[in-house]
Amino acid sequence: MTRSAALFCRPVPAILFILSLLILDQAIKYAVEVSLPMHELVPVVPMLGLFRTHNLGVAFSMLSHLDAWVIVVMRLAIVAFVAWLWRQTSRDHQFAHLGYCLIIAGAFGNIIDRFTYGYVVDYILFHTETWSFAVFNLADSLITIGAGFILLEELLVLRRSKG
């Protein structure tokens, strides 16, 4: 059985998709910056709220002691590596190509924040009365979901090779 080439292995659809996600990410972050109070929980539904904060580091505020330019260069190097992996991926691995698009969109979304604000805008908070998860943003979610799609593709490849 032949599988068709993945939509997002083609440059134009991939770039348009990434740009659309970047515009959405930046529009939300701008709205958060101008509308939400700093460090005040705005409940959305039980266990989910908006909570505006600034992240000077990377995931979970790690490396916040480093100069902003070091973090930007590090992120650009990671994006370059992800782009290289993407180009090495077989054209019929649809989930992997989608995953790489999501990761690159998310990474660039946070890099743009660094240049625009000097920090990354975080605003999504999962919580209960006694517990809360780290505050994150759409770009972080795109990176995580993208990694999930790449892992899914690897599992499917493994399953196909055994079948």
Curated annotation (Swiss-Prot):
Its EC number is 3.4.23.36. GO terms for cellular component: plasma membrane. It is an enzyme of class 3 (hydrolase). It catalyses: Release of signal peptides from bacterial membrane prolipoproteins. Hydrolyzes -Xaa-Yaa-Zaa-|-(S,diacylglyceryl)Cys-, in which Xaa is hydrophobic (preferably Leu), and Yaa (Ala or Ser) and Zaa (Gly or Ala) have small, neutral side chains. One of its GO terms (molecular function) is aspartic-type endopeptidase activity. It is a multi-pass membrane protein. PROSITE patterns: SPASE_II. GO terms for biological process: proteolysis. Belongs to the peptidase A8 family. This is Lipoprotein signal peptidase. The gene is lspA.
